[in-house]
Amino acid sequence: PVTRIEKTAGGWALTTPSGIVETRYIINAAGISAQAVHDMAAPHKFTIQPTRGEYYLLDKSEGSRVHHVIFQCPNENGKGVLVAPTVHGNLIVGPNADPVEGDDTACTAAGLAFVSAAARRSVPNIRFSESIRNFAGVRANVDTGDFVIGEAEGAPGFIDLAGMKSPGLSSAPAVAREAVKILEAHGDLPAPKADYRDGRTRVRFKELPPEEKARLIA
């Protein structure tokens, strides 16, 4: 983890347990730690409350209960409990919104009971006995009410991308373009690599033969 950030003549110096890293720019996309990282480099601007959301993933036998995402009215903590079909034919239900300390992704009986009761207000006949998986994630609930995107006041070259909650994944490409615009305004970005090729292999586990699935799991 980063333990200290200092401004230098050429940009920034970040102290870590592995040593000091020097860079011209910092993009603060540290999730629930973004407030702590920001406060090392610039005056305090926002507060993040880590908020756990718990989910049910139900068997495909429940996947046809709904044919599009069913939202309830959101509140100050987030989007509320939704019921949605997945691309693989399952049904996903959740989340709740419980303030936690740090990255606490434990599922709780109370949290899952809240999720199931809230979901039944939208879709009364869900069979939660068909649950095949429960999981939880922690989102960065920020007190500004919206994403924090921009160069920090009094800290040129330090860019916050913080407070990303429920739509963060969907908006990631647009957020990245905003970050690039800020960097371009400084006028010294390297040119894009014209010959860049994404060579990463994409494994579609569902489509693999049984022996290949077993090899990857082992």
Residue spans for each PLM region:
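A conserved beta-strand/loop element that lines the FAD pocket in flavoprotein oxidoreductases
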Residues: 1-2
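Flavin-dependent oxidoreductases
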Residues: 5-94, 98-108, 117, 123-126, ...
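C-terminal catalytic lobe of FAD-dependent flavoproteins
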Residues: 78-80, 87-88, 99, 103-217
